[in-house]
Amino acid sequence: KKKMNKNIIITVLLISNAIYAECSDLNQSDCDYWSAYCQWNSEQNICEETGGGGGNIEYGPYEFALLTETDGMPSSPFYNGALLFYPTNATPPFRSVIFIPAFGEAYGLEAWAEFVASHGYIGMTIGNYEGTEEDYWDYESRAVGLMAAREIIKEENERINSPLFSVVDTSNFIFSGHSTSGGGAHVAATLDSTINAVMLLNPAVAFVDSLNCPAETEYYCLIPEHLDHNVPTLVYAGETEYEELVSPDDDIYSNMWARPQYDYIPETTDKLWFESAGMGHGSAEQPVGAAAGHAL
């Protein structure tokens, strides 16, 4: 992983000529309404699928294969299923990047896991518990899930019949997540200083703090003291996501998004800000364009 310089602010202009049928017929207001799937490209005045301004994923030089729990990889009660991609023709030992999507099953960030595997990393993506599966699944639950996945990868390094037997760099792990699960990755950084880095994809986070947070938010909030950690951090954001997510009169949840998180990380911690111009909350959900290249 390239070393991240401190306090660099990068605004990237992402322009795409690709028009996607399922989003391109929408006007801006409808595009914003369907922001889970589409995003407005203000440079070209068109609606596109989420994921770095359109375009195709540019995979790296390595072939990769899939490992799942049906292949003998252990499961964990701390997350809801997993997909693990590993390079088949790269030189070990392999560093690992573990992803978790905002909601739903592991497939949500499958493209990111495949992308890093094609560049010589182990890429694992894990699923969330939802609804009746878990009564209490929050940011810390996601953090625990990421840490549990790390232990599963270490176990695979010891399992004789695993394709990862003796090829894992067991001292090098990066955690990543999108939106609320980016928040989970950030919580993990506050819990475990041995994490090598966190890569936060349009993150949202709040901490339970009965001393400093108001009762009307069930004592969830975000203040600088919550993010006092030394784990190198890459924060992705879309230029327009704050306006999409926060109303002008919102003084409760206004500081849980990407920019406040970046600002609250101590100046002594290596941190990097990456903003995609004209894009919203899905700007880094897929490994496309400059956002993908900057992750390497």
Labelled PLM ranges:
Residues 52-92:
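N-terminal cap/lid segment of alpha/beta-hydrolase-fold proteins
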